[in-house]
């Protein structure tokens, strides 16, 4: 009898989902990681908690801080744990909007882009792109020297910080200020920004947590 009731219930769910795919979905509250304040980011729908894991969410820093100057900063988070109707995330990347980056480059200036892979002291491996703009045109040798200094500063800063400390320096503009100082020792700088960050590899404990949580969710639903 119990098996028959289960079969009927399953058929009813299928029928409902065919009529209205949203009928069986629940809304989950998604939060930023603790090292970014653990603030509420958004509500997202899903039929099952497991289907949220590894989903990427993009917001602006303005959505978190309500500071209008943070509108050009896009943040990407990846859901990696679900507890009931609450989902927690880990940082996945950062990028400045193209319009903002274009606004920094003026006629008669030089653009220097430095891209390097860094590793934080707690094991996060990331690719960081730094954009520097000089006040006037500079030669190839100066560009190379500035690029080298940018890479040295970013690599050193990352190696000395955990992910939370590193992102704090990026989002508060401290790292950009240090890069500006490093660059202007070679040529006058107009602006320096951390243009993009992409997580290439998470620390082992971050990966274990994600897999453990997926397994736990699957076990609970079986």
UniProtKB/Swiss-Prot annotation:
Coiled-coil features, chain-numbered ranges: none
GO cellular component labels: ribonucleoprotein complex; ribosome
InterPro entries: Ribosomal_eS1, Ribosomal_eS1_arc
Keywords: Ribonucleoprotein, Ribosomal protein
Protein name as it appears in the record: Small ribosomal subunit protein eS1
Pfam families documented for this protein: Ribosomal_S3Ae (PF01015)
Higher taxonomy: Archaea, Thermoproteota, Thermoprotei, Thermoproteales, Thermoproteaceae
SMART domains xref list: Ribosomal_S3Ae
Single Gene Ontology MF annotation: structural constituent of ribosome
Assigned protein family: Belongs to the eukaryotic ribosomal protein eS1 family.
Provenance organism: Pyrobaculum calidifontis (strain DSM 21063 / JCM 11548 / VA1)
Listed GO biological process terms: translation
């Amino acid at each position: 009898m119990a098996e028959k009731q289960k079969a009927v219930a399953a058929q009813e769910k299928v029928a409902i989902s065919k009529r209205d795919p949203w009928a069986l979905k629940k809304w989950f509250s998604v939060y930023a990681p603790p090292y970014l304040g653990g603030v509420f980011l958004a509500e997202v729908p899903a039929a099952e908690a497991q289907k949220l894991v590894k989903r990427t969410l993009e917001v602006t820093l303005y959505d978190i801080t309500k500071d209008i100057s943070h509108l050009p900063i896009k943040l990407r988070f990846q859901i990696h744990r679900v507890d009931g109707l609450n989902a927690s995330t880990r940082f996945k990347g950062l990028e400045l909007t193209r319009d903002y980056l274009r606004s920094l480059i003026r006629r008669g200036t030089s653009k220097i882009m430095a891209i390097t892979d860094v590793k934080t002291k707690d094991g996060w491996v990331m690719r960081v792109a730094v954009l520097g703009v000089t006040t006037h045109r500079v030669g190839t040798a100066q560009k190379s020297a500035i690029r080298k200094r940018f890479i040295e500063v970013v690599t050193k800063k990352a190696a000395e910080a955990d992910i939370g400390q590193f992102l704090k320096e990026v989002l508060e503009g401290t790292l950009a200020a240090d890069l500006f100082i490093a660059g202007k020792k070679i040529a006058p700088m107009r602006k320096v920004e951390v243009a993009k960050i992409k997580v290439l590899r998470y620390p082992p404990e971050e990966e274990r947590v994600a897999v453990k949580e997926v397994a736990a969710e699957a076990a609970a639903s079986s």
